[in-house]
Amino acid sequence: MTIIWIEDHDPLPDPARVPFPASGLGAAGLDLSPARLYEAYRKGLFPWYSPGEPVLWWSPDPRMVLHCRELHIGRSLAKRIRQFDRPPEAGPVAGSAPSLCVTLNRAFPAVIAHCAQRGAARIGLGAARAGRDWPAPGAAQGRDGTWITPDIIAVYTAWHRMGYVHSVETWIGGRLAGGLYGVGLGRCFFGESMFSLAADASKVALAYLVRHLQARGTAWIDCQQETPHLASLGARPAARADFLELLAAGRDAPAPPWGSGRLRADGRLEAQPVA
């Protein structure tokens, strides 16, 4: 297998034009910057590496994709989501912040910090622990949650401030109970990592994200690698060529600006800030 070494001034290879192995690992380098991330995601690449390694760039074949209309919500999860769907006045004091709510872009630093916990599980939405529920290739090889290195945190936080990376947070009793973050480009969304500190908290965040994406006109989420867990939620594998066609059609499509606040049951943002 040939891995292309990328100098800081070199462009990343384009999987639509350059042969990549089915595993997805096709390039490596040292540059990890917001500009490099922007180039990578537009080409269907994402970084995944461990401390001490160069930045490794992946484009697996097949690629796991969750089409928003196909999200599978079981009976127990649907019941849990309805608890979060109650309007603010359903809280203990009329007009107060509800004891259960879901927000967008209100606690990104906390979300990525939870996702980065060392030794975190990668699989298991709803488990009372942090982890990557959208696993990168190689997850089955036994690497732990340390793939979210300080450099990853720094560059994705910078990209968040630039408006490209977004978090969804689940709150229970005023405390952060779960969440996720990912990358938004045009009408494309790329899931990066999730965590859960209470049963179903990350699943609720995912359900609200899907609603919000649909309200924005985004039809799918890139889940990166195929796993039985993702399949149980309705995600299915797509050939790399098909995924790249989806990406090409959506990455430059006009989309509403992202915001911050409480997410409503219909996927839209509350006009007022969350207390």
Spell out what each predicted region is.
Residues M1-A275:
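N-acyltransferase acceptor-side catalytic subdomain
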